[in-house]
Regions:
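A structural signal for the hydrophobic beta-strands that form the central parallel beta-sheet
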Residues: 27-28, 59, 130, 193
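A short beta-strand-loop structural module common to alpha/beta enzyme folds
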Residues: 53-66
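Non-catalytic interaction surface on structured domains
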Residues: 6, 39, 49-53
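Short catalytic-loop micro-motif centered on adjacent basic/acidic residues
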Residues: 33-34, 59-61, 130, 198
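Bacterial Sec-dependent signal peptides at the C-terminal "C-region" and cleavage site
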Residues: 1-24
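Catalytic nucleophile-elbow at a beta strand-turn-alpha helix junction centered on a G-D-S/GDSL motif
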Residues: 23-38, 63-66, 95
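Alpha-helical cap/lid subdomain in secreted, periplasmic
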Residues: 20, 44-53, 69-219
Length: 219
């Protein structure tokens, strides 16, 4: 009897040892990511579509954050959670705040601290996914006030993804292509955003779909 109990316990131990834990994913960003965990947000949508036994999704977004803010709070808000994957979605405030409050991030500082965030995560054996900032206005004729800067900062992120061989969710490109097909009136908002920047229902679903494609690649 006792031998049977020991044998059962041993088999149970072996079986649990081979049960893989869900991949823990932290979404690291600004107010768009902060809102992503709310009902109907893109992270909430991902939680409903990705298998819970394969993915654990955690939001780590704070409104107004720029790349330097992410760098400063990495330890408490990301590393302490011991993620397997970190999805970095930042850059819109680094550009937007240049015009709105004069507190944006200059290009050299943006790239330097973005690279520092990547290196810190990789030093902790965390897989990194990069995202380009999506929109500051949805007009399709390149007359949104900060299209030039947003394209430049998106190019910086694409370059970092190439140099570090990282997966990229190119939301800037995806939003531009979607708006070209679905914004015939050349509106500055209301297609994928509520206010030119933050996501509406369709925008959250669109981002969730883009994220899912990258997160499930190879699964």
């Amino acid at each position: 009897m006792r031998t049977g109990i020991y044998l059962f316990a041993f088999i149970l131990l072996l079986s649990t040892a081979f049960i893989s834990k869900p991949t823990r994913v932290v979404f690291f960003g600004d107010s768009i990511t902060q809102a992503g965990v709310n009902p109907g947000g893109y992270i909430d949508m991902l939680k409903k579509t990705l298998p819970a036994d394969q993915f654990e999704l955690i939001g780590a977004g704070i409104g107004g954050n720029k790349i330097y803010d992410l760098y400063l709070r990495m330890e408490d808000d990301v590393l302490a959670k011991k993620p397997d994957v970190v999805v970095i979605w930042v850059g819109v405030n680094d550009v937007w705040h240049k015009a709105s409050s004069g507190t944006g991030t200059d290009p050299d500082k943006f790239v330097r601290f973005y690279e520092a965030v990547i290196k810190k995560l990789q030093a902790n054996n965390i897989r990194v996914v990069l995202c380009t900032p999506a929109a500051i206005g949805e007009k399709t004729d390149m007359t949104n006030q900060q299209d030039g800067d947003l394209n430049q900062y998106s190019a910086f992120i694409r370059d970092l993804a190439t140099r570090y061989n990282l997966p990229l969710v190119d939301l800037r490109k995806a939003f531009q292509e979607y708006d070209l097909k679905n914004n015939p009136e050349n509106k500055d908002r209301g297609v994928l955003t509520t206010d030119r920047v933050h996501l509406n229902e369709k925008g959250n679903q669109f981002v969730a779909d883009q994220m899912k494609a990258v997160l499930t690649a190879g699964k």
